[in-house]
Amino acid sequence: MQVYGLNHWGDSFLSCNLHRIEHYIKPYLGNVAVKDLTTHDLDLFYDSLQDKPTVVLKGHKKTDACVSRSVIEKTHALLRSALNQAVIWEYIPINPALRVTLPKYQPQERTVWSASEAQQALDSCTDPVLKLCMLLALGCSMRVGEILGLTWDCVDISEDAICAGTAHVRITKELKRCQKDSLAALERRGRSTVLLTFPEWKQTGSSTSLVLKAPKTESSVRKVFLPKTVALALAEEKGRQQEIKELLAGGYQDFDLVVAHEDGRPYEERQVAFLLRKLTDATGLPPVVFHSLRHCSASLKLQIGGGNIKAVQGDTGHAQSRMVTDLYAHTNNEERRRLAEKVETDFFQKRADTPQEKPLDNAAEQAYRLLRENPDIARLIIATLQKQA
């Protein structure tokens, strides 16, 4: 961990892996020497984890559930990586994690709104903060942390830009709540990506800090052009914030945030998630997590843009185009129904409307062949028919 993890992992991945080591690996395998660890040991370990109580990160809602198969798979990935490193360092000759049998895991498909459901959500939303967040997610394919970390100095919504269709946002940072110990460890290694640490407004001590930090990957730093509706909503919010600043004067805590409380303090992901739950409860729309709006946005852009994957990838900030097609090309039943109708009209009905040459029966075929091979007989038959007429 000290040699590899702190030199390669970001704060979130580091925190999650430290949590898995502390609560899932050390209690059950901590007394086993690496050289003595076998594939059978790991098989038994993963099987037993299914009956162990899950341990949630600090600040997360407690649960009575047992360790999920998703967590087991991630724990295995961590162990496999660590044991690969042990092979490289020549502590062991082979990696015992390579041939383990994991409990079967079927990833749960995330619910994603259709275009009509997303439009209904926007039309029904009366909370200005949630509506602005939804517009940025659907219009710009932004992650929730990128939306909450967006600052006005990265927004171009001048009248000229809106008229010319060049209004845009520059995504250069994200807002995130991180474990203090992970942040401190990365800081000591000179790998901190924190740009700003927000004050702690709660009096009680916390193990986490709310920060503005650089995005997770280089490709996440990007420029996204704004649909006019989104640009106008941002302009309206900027005017509203200016009025509040003048009203509160020194009482406004100005962090230059686009999405902010009435006194300037930042919103957090859990607060936006709560607002979204209230909206789905009130409207009867399918309950979704906020990140699924980004899925919805990417799918809409793929459809509207005729499958222009590179353009969509530029908006989503994914490092690889495969991630856009694999994760975000969400196809719903209505689209599949329309596709079936199009196959019917463009293929089967056209085939039915095309005149088909009827096959000849055996007697007719023999007569036809006889006339072709004996043109004199054919002329005689024609002359006879003409006389009868």
PLM segments and residue spans:
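C-terminal secondary-structure termini that scaffold catalytic or DNA-interacting sites
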Residues: I157-H168, K173-V221, V230, D263, ...
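Basic, Lys/Arg- and aromatic-enriched nucleic-acid-binding interface segment
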Residues: V55-K58, T63-R69, E73-T75, I88, ...
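Proline-centered turn/helix-capping motifs that create local helix->coil transitions or kinks
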Residues: V87-P96, D156-C163, R177-L183, L234-A249
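C-terminal catalytic core of tyrosine-transesterase DNA break-rejoin enzymes
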Residues: S70, I88, L135, G139, ...
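N-terminal DNA-binding module of tyrosine recombinases/phage integrases
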Residues: M1-D43, E237, Q241-D254, N333, ...
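Active-site/catalytic core of tyrosine-dependent DNA strand-transfer enzymes
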Residues: S68, L195-V211, P215-L285
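N-terminal core-binding DNA-recognition domain of tyrosine site-specific recombinases/integrases
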Residues: Q2-W89, P107, R265-Q271, P286-S292, ...
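Catalytic-site neighborhood detector that most strongly recognizes the C-terminal catalytic loop/helix
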Residues: K104, V112, C163, K173-R177, ...
